[in-house]
């Protein structure tokens, strides 16, 4: 109450910011007449003038009014579009590192040109982030004309581009690309073996288009680069035979009394959390069955450390059978399991569930089981975008998530007023008892719109629902077009024409995002079609264009008179923001429009969160069949349910981020080390530090710290140094000859002997010949252990919640154990690198160079590299790295290269891990060749 009172007096934070920005808008408007008088060359010369002023110490904020005036004038000349004052406000919010909420149709793409131009003047690069390749291409070409006119370079960063083209795109003043591609380039840059192979420069400033989609909807799914891992096909098939023999328990047991179970069973299913849990009896039965199938040794428990993987596979098979259903969560097409996206209903071709779940579903369906992948590198969008020096975003719907943007990213949301107020009529929801009644009412509404000529956009949340509407409209004899997973290529064209008279378009949630629905149809597309028709001469084209313009004007006014675009939705999404996005398709730039949601008590959101309350209202009112309830209290109940779901989803994302922050800190350390190794001209100091650490640890196994001579095992230490490290030193003799020797002296003696042994090897061929080999051994070891570490963190994360039962804080336990694992990773790298460099037998610089090249090739040529990333529709896309596959094929690694490498590793013990980093024993890997 007090807050509202103060807001009325002083205005909200948003009002105060806009008031401040409006003063700058007045200064920009005052400059307009002066800039209009400039010639094209004079306007273009402003860019160099601004750069010179920055070099002399002026800030971007000092230049803002003039820079914005330059862009506005350039846009008038090149694009025939003048920035509105509200677009200048949006540009200032973006420059200040905030999120600008601008309604659909308010010109976000043009608004972005203002801060993009201003920040590009610094010469540090600006990244414009879009949700898909189509928009990146479209915006770069469309707005590129303006930037080029003003003397700035523009690059487009697309998937599968050759490395040289990517470097050129990132070297431009302004780079357009998708969020996924920027993130993957960052990960790939931290996997290269040559400094010149990196493509990105510093992460200076990014503007994220559709920021809610990228930083919230896609934030639960990390970017993952993976390669082929070990094959467990037989295990999946065997466990698939065990699972049908376990029975489901009906009812839930009260933890205090044990009552509540109606039918005893081996496992319970929790649909809300999407998990399956074995009961106590179920554990015993599962262990017995696994023993019968020879999967579990006699007397062993599923909880033994050695059987963690088996438990993991059993859980995946139970979830696959009881929580993932064919034609609802996935479809089987051409012998493959294809996931159906729960939000949009689109088929996610190429995407695979992780943690062995996809393979378990493949085993259940009896299709070919494809091998699991090993994660090579991974990052979440939260942690990638927080690497930028300055971040900003724009969207039509950010206000409902403003708290999350502030909490997670430190981004403030500024609501930019529309240029013209919307005339859209958002009608109250209509709630019916059954799904059948709901669809009948929606079809009747569509029929009425069609008969009077009003265009309709029908929004659905899944392919399944869009197909139901499609079938009902066909049955009703109403012509329409469907926009879902099967129509990707035509999305923008269909959406552009969805505003024509008598047009009925069915669209899943995010289809065709980024394209405006213009009442009467998109005239630009119509004119473009005429201009591209080579069969017409210029005079005919001009006449046809004039005719099309007249016809469009009539249609436009006619559709406006009917009430504009009608939005009909057949269910509420669990996020208010996505409902608002659907509504926002109508009533653009002051056009009329209307929207209505048709719901039933059977809808998932109603059933789980709001159904009982609304059903009670219906029963009290004694509603007859076919009648709907339409009241503010119902709409508010539904919005309250949505708020609960949004809060829950926010908590999930926040918790994920807190866990990911642990691996993010470790990722920064590893990537920093990698870059230092890549850029260093000489690695001898780093290698010496690793060697000292390794031999100190070795000595401490035989000569404990602060111990007396009687506790020392010098004979054992001598033997180990000779057998494992090739260092022959009469340690016992030296100690006996000396007057007084401490444990620290022993360490110094052994480290000196190791240094002398290594220096003698280096002196043989020269340090400069050795550096590249050292670099490759270091990078290979870091990469191999980092990948194993990522898998360990993943497994740790999955079981960490169980620590809560031991009265421990799972998050703290995760941090502690992850830190221990990271310490083990660094120790493993230290020991492995030292062992490889100490035991390698070197005869010539050429031989060492060949071995370094072979290590580099092995590091770069991982087979079947795939990229897993969320898309703007909520689906997760997985694609193969075609460039990588071509490079491997071209390299054609043969025995000659491997033979040279094997010779270089000739002093490695037969049962030791192979120095190439494959994880196999030396005798089963390169030892075969020596």
From Swiss-Prot:
<feature type="binding site">
    <location>
        <position position="925"/>
    </location>
    <ligand>
        <name>Zn(2+)</name>
    </ligand>
</feature>
<dbReference type="GO" id="GO:0043952">
    <property type="term" value="P:protein transport by the Sec complex"/>
</dbReference>
<feature type="binding site">
    <location>
        <position position="87"/>
    </location>
    <ligand>
        <name>ATP</name>
    </ligand>
</feature>
<dbReference type="InterPro" id="IPR036670">
    <property type="entry name" value="SecA_X-link_sf"/>
</dbReference>
<keyword id="KW-0963">Cytoplasm</keyword>
<dbReference type="GO" id="GO:0005524">
    <property type="term" value="F:ATP binding"/>
</dbReference>
<feature type="binding site">
    <location>
        <position position="916"/>
    </location>
    <ligand>
        <name>Zn(2+)</name>
    </ligand>
</feature>
<dbReference type="GO" id="GO:0017038">
    <property type="term" value="P:protein import"/>
</dbReference>
<keyword id="KW-0862">Zinc</keyword>
<dbReference type="GO" id="GO:0006605">
    <property type="term" value="P:protein targeting"/>
</dbReference>
<dbReference type="InterPro" id="IPR011116">
    <property type="entry name" value="SecA_Wing/Scaffold"/>
</dbReference>
<keyword id="KW-0813">Transport</keyword>
<dbReference type="InterPro" id="IPR027417">
    <property type="entry name" value="P-loop_NTPase"/>
</dbReference>
<dbReference type="GO" id="GO:0065002">
    <property type="term" value="P:intracellular protein transmembrane transport"/>
</dbReference>
<keyword id="KW-0653">Protein transport</keyword>
<feature type="binding site">
    <location>
        <position position="516"/>
    </location>
    <ligand>
        <name>ATP</name>
    </ligand>
</feature>
<keyword id="KW-0811">Translocation</keyword>
<dbReference type="InterPro" id="IPR020937">
    <property type="entry name" value="SecA_CS"/>
</dbReference>
<keyword id="KW-0472">Membrane</keyword>
<keyword id="KW-1003">Cell membrane</keyword>
<dbReference type="GO" id="GO:0005886">
    <property type="term" value="C:plasma membrane"/>
</dbReference>
<dbReference type="InterPro" id="IPR036266">
    <property type="entry name" value="SecA_Wing/Scaffold_sf"/>
</dbReference>
<dbReference type="GO" id="GO:0031522">
    <property type="term" value="C:cell envelope Sec protein transport complex"/>
</dbReference>
<keyword id="KW-0067">ATP-binding</keyword>
<keyword id="KW-0997">Cell inner membrane</keyword>
<comment type="subunit">
    <text>Monomer and homodimer. Part of the essential Sec protein translocation apparatus which comprises SecA, SecYEG and auxiliary proteins SecDF-YajC and YidC.</text>
</comment>
<dbReference type="InterPro" id="IPR044722">
    <property type="entry name" value="SecA_SF2_C"/>
</dbReference>
<dbReference type="Pfam" id="PF01043">
    <property type="entry name" value="SecA_PP_bind"/>
</dbReference>
<dbReference type="InterPro" id="IPR011115">
    <property type="entry name" value="SecA_DEAD"/>
</dbReference>
<dbReference type="InterPro" id="IPR004027">
    <property type="entry name" value="SEC_C_motif"/>
</dbReference>
<feature type="binding site">
    <location>
        <begin position="105"/>
        <end position="109"/>
    </location>
    <ligand>
        <name>ATP</name>
    </ligand>
</feature>
<dbReference type="Pfam" id="PF02810">
    <property type="entry name" value="SEC-C"/>
</dbReference>
<dbReference type="InterPro" id="IPR014001">
    <property type="entry name" value="Helicase_ATP-bd"/>
</dbReference>
<dbReference type="InterPro" id="IPR001650">
    <property type="entry name" value="Helicase_C-like"/>
</dbReference>
<dbReference type="InterPro" id="IPR011130">
    <property type="entry name" value="SecA_preprotein_X-link_dom"/>
</dbReference>
<feature type="binding site">
    <location>
        <position position="914"/>
    </location>
    <ligand>
        <name>Zn(2+)</name>
    </ligand>
</feature>
<dbReference type="GO" id="GO:0008564">
    <property type="term" value="F:protein-exporting ATPase activity"/>
</dbReference>
<keyword id="KW-0479">Metal-binding</keyword>
<dbReference type="Pfam" id="PF07517">
    <property type="entry name" value="SecA_DEAD"/>
</dbReference>
<comment type="function">
    <text>Part of the Sec protein translocase complex. Interacts with the SecYEG preprotein conducting channel. Has a central role in coupling the hydrolysis of ATP to the transfer of proteins into and across the cell membrane, serving both as a receptor for the preprotein-SecB complex and as an ATP-driven molecular motor driving the stepwise translocation of polypeptide chains across the membrane.</text>
</comment>
<dbReference type="InterPro" id="IPR000185">
    <property type="entry name" value="SecA"/>
</dbReference>
<feature type="binding site">
    <location>
        <position position="926"/>
    </location>
    <ligand>
        <name>Zn(2+)</name>
    </ligand>
</feature>
